[in-house]
Amino acid sequence: MPTEGADPPSKSHQPKDWFARSEAQQTRLPWLLIACVVLLEIVPFGCHRSANVVTAYIAQDQVYAEPILAQFTKETGIKVRAVFDSEAVKTVAIANRLLAERGHPQCDVFWGNEELRTRQLAAEGVFRETNAWTAVGFRSRRLVINTNRMSLAEAPKSLLELTNASWRGQVAMAYPLFGTTATHLLALRNRWGDAVWVAWCRALQANRPFVVDGNSVVVQFVARGQARIGLTDSDDIAAAQREGAPVAALPLTAESLLIPNTVAVVRRAPHPEPAQKLYEFLQRPEVVEQLVAVRALEGGGLAQSAAAGLQPDWSAVLRDLNPATEILKQIFLK
């Protein structure tokens, strides 16, 4: 071995087979690269295939979902990377993200809080082909009143009455382009027919409702007396009642809508085995009972309760989703 500072060996001292070895190495290099690419295809990004993690996009309220997910992790050792969404645009924003990621899925499990967007995603091929999604428990769309300002007997018996002059400037609702409010209005279109529905939407908007950022805000408006009545979700009414707010839900009618939670596994989920475990866990009766106990859900037997409200033809609702949504934009986003 040459000492430090010594002249480098001359070319005549280079090993005679140097070029041959170099040529062989260059020949092997493309095959090594191909092998690496194949391995990356089989196990992309290494840690993403960990058996101890699952990514879930969640539209259920974070305050209700987190204890359930913590219980799942404690039982299985699988960490849940949870992505939640905002009150104002939840479900729609998550749905758009899942649609955008179809070619390179980042999510394993979708925990939805209403049915329409889940059906839309299923129709768009976002979920796996078999055992793709299921409904889990239910809550409902309700009218909420301020009990200090009106009695149940004084409350309207139909949503059609909300366009009467007596309710001018007295009704609160969330933006009807997102979440359960959009689903409810689109289901009403399916029941009433397009002409009656469009006329009602226009008359309702002309009656100066408070259109606010989310169903919990609807209940707050009613609780504070800023509105006498609101169109919202049963779990938001329950949350306000726990805090002592003077609000009450009107009984279910033929115009009410039962809204199940949904659970789905994404097609080509990065973590299929943990995804299946979470999918099964969220369907357990005891998990549903926990959500009912905190009034995030009203019950677990959707089939037995479905007769209490609207029963939309979901295929027709999906078929008309885009034009009907455009009508809602034109009416409520002036």
Residue ranges of model-derived segments:
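Early extracytoplasmic/lumenal segment of secretory-pathway proteins
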Residues: 48-120
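A structural signal for short loop-to-beta-strand junctions that line the ligand-binding cleft
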Residues: 105-110, 126-143, 160, 170-173
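Short beta-strand->loop
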Residues: 128-135, 160, 229, 245-257, ...
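A bilobed periplasmic-binding-protein/Venus flytrap-type ligand-binding module shared by bacterial periplasmic
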Residues: 142-149, 259-274, 290
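Flexible hinge/capping segments at coil-to-helix
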Residues: 151-167
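Periplasmic-binding protein-like
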Residues: 169-176, 281-302
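Ligand-binding pocket segment of bilobal, Venus flytrap-like solute-binding proteins
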Residues: 176, 180-183, 187-252
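An extracytoplasmic/periplasmic, membrane-proximal ligand-sensing/linker region
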Residues: 195-197, 299-334
